[in-house]
């Protein structure tokens, strides 16, 4: 049986409802270098189920953790601009800790809509710790960012902060979301600096949006009773407040859509996952 030819820039399934059936909704762009931002999107969608969501990820330049700050700023500006030219955006969430630490000032200077960033949840972790030892698990770029060091200086002076930067763990999270198995031995190797401590952190800040995707596996490797904290819920509350504070907010009747920077076998395999998150279409974003 013959099938309709598919646009080389699009992977999709048939829309269940037509555009005319959809009420206008404010459009929120969620951006990450990979699929870790879906953990933040989940938190936002739970609080704001009726927004029009766009998820964009940079699978060409992924991962950002080893890139220069200058490269990340220019790349994020380019991608957000490309999306903004196609959709009337009400808000943008940079669901990437590495990108947030360097790109927010430039984004807020260029665009009129609010831009929300993700920063390590150090302040709540300090409140939760019982032994006074808090671990920050993030990319190397986030661990060494001046913004992160400022957060520690402001909120964690009474605690011992153990920093652990790993881009390998980002790759592990991506593998899991693509349907792969997470080897616990790999996690043990990554976390060895903490696991070998006489008094390891009892509270861990998941300072990369990929890492909440691995909470079950991390719990099997970390000492029993270790608490894990991320900023997803706080970002969702901030997003809700900013949306509610806008007057004459721009809206769209389009269905949710995901954008990548290149279509390949990996993105083809990722489509069912994106559909399960509420994104029926995946397209290449021309930049």
Curated annotation (Swiss-Prot):
UniProt record, GO biological process: cell wall organization; peptidoglycan biosynthetic process; regulation of cell shape
Gene (UniProt): murI
Polar residues compositional bias, start-end: 1-15
Pathway participation: Cell wall biogenesis; peptidoglycan biosynthesis
Alphabetized GO MF terms: glutamate racemase activity
Stretches for region Disordered: 1-25
PROSITE patterns with a match to the protein in the record: ASP_GLU_RACEMASE_1 (PS00923), ASP_GLU_RACEMASE_2 (PS00924)
Active site: 96, 208
Binding positions (substrate): 32-33, 64-65, 97-98, 209-210
Protein name as annotated: Glutamate racemase
Main function: Provides the (R)-glutamate required for cell wall biosynthesis.
Keyword Kinase: no
Top-rank EC class of the record's enzyme: isomerase
Catalytic activity entry: L-glutamate = D-glutamate
